[in-house]
Amino acid sequence: MTIIRKSHPLMKLINHAFIDLPAPSNISGWWNFGSLLGVCLIIQISTGLFLSMHYTSDTLTAFSSVSHICRDVNYGWLIRYMHANGASLFFICLYFHIGRGIYYGSYLYKETWNIGIILLLMGMATGFMGYVLPWGQMSFWGATVITNLLSAIPYIGSEMVEWIWGGFSVDKATLTRFFAFHFILPFIIAEMAMVHLLFLHETGSNNPLGIMSDSDKIPFHSYYSLKDLLRVVALLAFYLTIGFFFPDALGDPDNNTSANPLNTPPHIKLEWYSLLAYAILRSIPNKLGXVIXLVFSILVLALFPLLHTSNQRGXMFRPISQTLFWLLISDLIILTWIGGQPVEPPFIIIGQLASIFYFSNILILLPVAGLIENKLLKW
């Protein structure tokens, strides 16, 4: 078996990536979320494939087809709720994964980090289009509001919106193309994840101390493969608990009503994992300014390698940066909460202050903290 593992062209690739891969001996559970994301992606592709066999991307029958899946298809309700809650689970793991990268300075592997940002954008686009497919009330109005933001682009905005809609409003053509893109994007994400892994294995994994670990490596299997397996079991237990006992906890009640273009909901809300960017969008009264802030709220992650001023890689031994990091996490939780609230006082001013702090923390406070910590170390 060992000879085949190390000589067969296909097995050799798997061996180098998952078996004999040299890994730092001190990486913690925070390095586990990459493999959990892989598990989530496999679950999403598998359940999505079965759902697509029964779903119809037509405005007249989309809502009924989702109802049919839940009522008439064997275990259709389970597949539907696994897919819906699997998206939330995917983003929970994704945000933990990004948070670990920021805290421990993994963003200094620039190629791996930038591909990760592309994966985040593709994941958010896939999640948004999936949110539209059940053709509930919030699906329709969410699609209308978000796609209409492109009209803020000078000169070509209005034409772009009509081009995406396939007409003069969100209708059958929009739903059909959203279904097509929602089906193909997870496979592209899987391909990009392989490229992400390829670049990661060029440099090797970072570790909590942020130091070179070439002299102290251990094989990935069986040390970390079993460690990952334990957390996969824990993830699946949590996943099935949500799916069986609280299937609608992370959804919107308005989506249990079929889409009605003549009845606008009092408050248009996206899925929880998009709410922090949505809150930043709403905090700026100008339409173009808000769209710029929305895009920049994600792309600002690409500036982390350029704004790294500390002589140390991670924030393990940097108390000022640690404090700012946890303030940033608190700020993101506040933005997520604000994104789910109506646009009225006091939520408007809270959202604006949280948005200002988000950008100022990343662009000003964290780099300044790194410089201060460098000075303190020389005393």
From Swiss-Prot:
Location in the cell: Mitochondrion inner membrane
Membrane topology: Multi-pass membrane protein
Keywords of the record: Electron transport, Heme, Iron, Membrane, Metal-binding, Mitochondrion, Mitochondrion inner membrane, Respiratory chain, Transmembrane, Transmembrane helix, Transport, Ubiquinone
Residues binding heme b b566, per UniProt: H97, H196
Ligand binding (a ubiquinone): H201
Pfam families in alphabetical order: Cytochrom_B_C, Cytochrome_B
Cofactor entry: heme b
Protein name in the entry: Cytochrome b
Organism of provenance: Perognathus flavescens
